[in-house]
Every structure is written in C-alpha cells, then in structure tokens.
Swiss-Prot record:
It comes from Papaver somniferum. It catalyses: (7S)-salutaridinol + NADP(+) = salutaridine + NADPH + H(+). This is Salutaridine reductase. Optimum pH is between 5.5 and 6.0. One of its GO terms (molecular function) is NADP binding. InterPro entries: CBR1-like, NAD(P)-bd_dom_sf, SDR_fam. Substrate binds at residues 129, 180. The lineage of its organism: Eukaryota, Viridiplantae, Streptophyta, Embryophyta, Tracheophyta.
Length: 311
C-alpha cells in the first residue's frame, strides 16, 4: 500500500526511484528529497519499502512516500503506481530506473572469507571479480540470466512505458537509467550482439530484444562460451549494454525528454558485498547530478560516474 498523501495535486517536482529501499536507490531518494523534490520510493517488498521511508522521515526527509512496484509485473503494480502519481501529483518529472540484480549466485561464505584474506582496506579488493578463483565461487544459470534480463532491461522498459504519459505532462521530463561500466560495448564479446548494439543509427527496441533473446537461447543451450559471450557475468554485462542501447533509442524517440544512463561507479553495497571505490552516498551523487541537469541539458549519453563516456 502507498503512503498517505494529501488529495491535492502539487506543483512540486515529483520523482520515482525504483529499487529505492536500500543501497544506491535509498541514497538517491534522500538526495532528491534534499533538493526539494517529492520522491516516490518504490520497491517490491512492502515492509522494506515502508521501513525505508520511515528511516528517511526520521532524518527530516518528509517529502518521501512509498508505493509498491514490482518491475517484473507490468500490469498490477505499475498501473497502480501510475494512478497514484496522477491522483496525487498530476505529473511525473523524474524517473530513475535503479532496480537491478547481478544475474549470478555466490558461495557467500567462501567469498566473504576471500574478501577477509585480501583485506577490506586493500586496493586489490576492487579487482576481486576479475580473479578466476573468485569467479569459481559464482554460478550463472539460465534461470538467473532470465531474471537478470527481466529486471535490468525488460523491467526498465515496462516501467518507463507505463510512466511516459505522466512524464509528458512535465515541463522538463528526465529519465536516468542506472547502468554499469561493464555494459560498455568493449565488454560485449559476441560478434552479432556487438554489431547490433554498436550501430547507433540502426538501433531499435526490436533489435535490442534480439540480443536479449540470443543470449537467453545460448544460456539454455549451454553455448555461452562457444558463441563468444563473456565467460563471466554474461547476463549482467548484456543487460546493461542493452539498457544503454535502449537509452539511446528512447532519447531519439522522445526528443523533449532528457534520457541518459550512468554508471555510479563500483559502490560499496550489499549486492557487492561491501566492495567498491565509492560509498552509496557518493554513487548516488553521480546519478542525482544527471537527474538535476539544467533544462537545456544533454540527452542520449552515457556517463561513467561524473565523466562523459563512450557507449
């Protein structure tokens, strides 16, 4: 259930943040709120969502409310969210698509032991995902890959499509897709996928969907390495590369909008087992900066932290 709101349409700018109950998403909500924006914090778990809002309100962030959103459920919670925003705020100004999953499972106890052996303050820790012995503790399956693409790519598309009519009512609509540097084209090793995603002029949602379907087919048939996909993190890398491509398509499709994607950096979150170069607060700053670009700000770009980056 959503938080109680006044039954009046407000002129205050309104933002929706997916996956807002913890980590980067929570900090994005906090920082947008600090900038005077009315924030609708969303996540799948109702209890965790209410707890997150209560925590924010206890730290004097009153302009935050919760509404449940399951990005894999394109009918029930998305329609309810859209109705809620229309009733209470009349429009939507900012959409931050932050919800995401890693796409692999981890032998947590052994991985934490490896972190401990390296040392939590060691500069080598941020390179742990590159170590073969660490990758051996991580497992990728078709089911996990399917979930990863469903949340990180298809979920973003579904939420965005439902909320576009409300964004169109804004004087300065913005969409920020939280991506990753691993979604850069230089990490897309399947030749067909690279050809499709790298051709910005020919990009369409249908062509991006082709890449998603190719990857899932190869996962199901155990052909990931045979067909040249990344040997580790194929689902996550592809999901973020497809998200970046979708950002480009959307920016071209709706020139009135500011649509950008950003890698917040390797952030010390629960999903990363506390490994990273940035705190959640610092990672969120990279996202919020783009969400609050001036009205004549850029669109259709990829940012790595605060720097403009090639796709």
């Amino acid at each position: 259930m959503p938080e109680t709101c006044p039954n009046t349409v407000t002129k205050r700018r309104c933002a929706v943040v997916t996956g807002g109950n913890k980590g980067i998403g929570f900090e994005i909500c906090k920082q947008l709120s600090s900038n005077g924006i009315m924030v609708v914090l969303t996540c799948r778990d109702v209890t965790k969502g209410h707890e997150a809002v209560e925590k924010l309100k206890n730290s004097n962030h009153e302009n935050v409310v919760f509404h449940q959103l399951d990005v894999t459920d394109p009918i029930a919670t998305m329609s309810s969210l859209a109705d809620f925003i229309k009733t209470h705020f009349g429009k939507l100004d900012i959409l931050v698509n932050n919800a995401g999953v890693a796409g692999f499972s981890v032998d947590a106890d052994r991985f934490k032991a490896m972190i401990s052996d390296i040392g939590e303050d060691s500069e080598e820790l941020v390179k742990i995902y590159e170590k073969p012995e660490a990758q051996e503790l991580m497992s990728e399956t078709y089911e996990l890959a399917e979930e990863c693409l469903k949340i990180n790519y298809n979920g973003v598309k579904s939420v965005t499509e439902v909320l576009i009519p409300l964004l169109q009512l804004s004087d300065s609509p913005r969409i920020v897709n939280v991506s990753s540097s691993t979604g850069s084209l230089k990490y897309v090793s399947n030749e067909t996928a690279l050809e499709i995603l790298g051709d910005g002029d020919a990009l369409t949602e249908e062509r991006i969907d082709m890449v998603v379907n190719m990857l899932l087919k190869d996962f199901k048939e155990n052909l990931i390495e045979t067909n040249g996909w990344p040997s580790f993190g194929a689902a996550y890398t592809t999901s973020k590369a497809c998200l970046n491509a979708y950002t480009r398509v959307l920016a071209n499709k709706i020139p009135k909008f500011q649509v950008n994607c950003v890698c917040p950096g390797l952030v010390k979150t629960e999903m990363n087992y506390g490994i990273g170069n940035y705190t959640a607060e610092e990672g969120a700053e990279h996202v919020v900066r783009i969400a609050l670009f001036p009205d004549d700000g850029p669109s259709g770009f990829f940012y790595d932290c605060s720097e403009l980056s090639a796709f």
